[in-house]
Amino acid sequence: MRLKRLFLGVMLLVGITGAGAANAAPEDISASISLKVPGNDAKQYPLALQKMQDGMYSCRASETLPLDIIRQVVDKDGKQRITVTLKALENVYFNYGEQIKTGYKHSDCQFYMPGFWYRRNLRSPKEAPSFHTSDSWLVREDRLSTPLTAAFNPASGTSMSVIRIDKFDKEALTTHKEGEIILSGETSIGYTGFCNVDGVTVLAYGFPYKEAPKTYIRKLTLAPAVEAFQLLRKGDSISMTWEVSERNAADFSECVQRTWEYCYDTNRPKPVDTPYTVDRMKEVMSNFFVESYVGNTPTHYYSGVELETATCANTDVAEVGFVGRTLLNAFNALEYGKQQNRQDLVDNANHIFDTYLQNGFSPAGFFNEVVHYNRGFKETRHSIRRQSEGVYAILNYLNYEKQQKRKHPEWEKRIKGMLDSFLKLQNEDGSFPRKFKDDFSIVDASGGSTPSATLPLVMASKYFKDKRYLASAKHTVDYLEKELISKADYFSSTLDANCEDKEASLYAATAAYYLALVTKGEERAHYAGLAKKAAYFALSWY
């Protein structure tokens, strides 16, 4: 309960902050529509906004178009709600778009597209969307957790955003992934993004989707731009709605916080109704502990790495932490098995702990964190994340066993040895190297995975009553505060890429949260504040 109360306190320390005024004048708006006849190149028509009455505009091209376009703007609570309605005078394939000038100098700006783009994505490689490739990007809305783009201007301490308002209940297949493509039916998906126009940032949005200057088709693979065209039949109409708002923000972290709160208030997500109870889902999920158990290798494990979804057949990969999480799964199986009187789950979990104690360590005392048994391969490069997650799992196991009046002195000795090795690995600035070898030589010095070590260090300080571990944990958060949280630069927690990373923000928030649990007064409030600041970045991915 104390855990829940602190979490709620962290999330509710600051009330929801309203958006400021956003008054985009007609001269700050540029609109265009592209029309395509299948088999021919599309033609783009710039549109002039002709005022019909207050807040109502007719969008006109320099030549007669086969559709009418009406743009309505409603000011409400300092925000502008824009609704564009197209009515076809004959069958037409269209792509409509707008741009709004922010007035911000593009070279000053940082950008936020929830779950996809943070600041300038400069930690991402040039093979992925980032400023390395272009300073202007348009993307499909369904790449984002919310169909929104925000530009933050540190010079003025302001941020402007545009969000799409729709039901998002339609999608259509296409035969091509690049170039001008015809949709096979109706879609709900438009596009959003930002562009550098003569050194000034503009927010760009439209419908249906397009992506430019590249489309991201799979990991580290950029393809040529794509632009979709949807059929609007003669006599039919379609309406699209966006909302533009502006807000003050002291830094990029506050921009993310306030924009996420605005997204939440705008979208008002609600719990998903489901006929399944928690107990029923636990029962179903516990089948993983049965089906994936491998008991004929030197260390027993649950198979979940490199899984082929077509067969779900067990593989030869035993992994501590990250995807495999064999030791934490064993603890979960043990605890659940005891609760449900499932002796099979309890026995298998204990076999995993026993075999890892006997055969699961490197010569230097670190976990053999990845073993390919059929291939006869053991990963010799250790990661602070997998090692930490293994220690975290064993500390949970030891604490549980202690409550059952059972002792495991050999495990305690092993874990203390690993934790003492952690203290040797820790850098003067509080960080831990991302990857290292048995001889403590560094493979990857990046400190982004540091918060994964904070959790077991805090737990160990309580379990072993050793203040050294708590001091080390506090030093990790000194590093996190200086290099990640204060800079809004969450990176490299995941093991397969050293880039902007939701797990890094989640781990940073959790690390600060753990320290808030074991401290008091102003120190506790400070850690809780750091946890809240990092938590908004983690939340923004969802």
What is the predicted function of each stretch?
Residues 405, 410, 419-431, 436-451, ...:
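Alpha-solenoid helical repeat scaffolds
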Residues 297-319, 365-386, 431-452, 489-514:
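Carbohydrate-binding/catalytic loop surfaces
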Residues 255-291, 341-359, 403-423, 465-482, ...:
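Extended, well-ordered alpha-helical scaffold segments
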Residues 229-254:
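Short Pro-Gly-centered flexible turn/kink motifs
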Residues 40, 53, 59-234:
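Beta-strand/loop-rich accessory regions of lumenal/periplasmic or secreted enzymes
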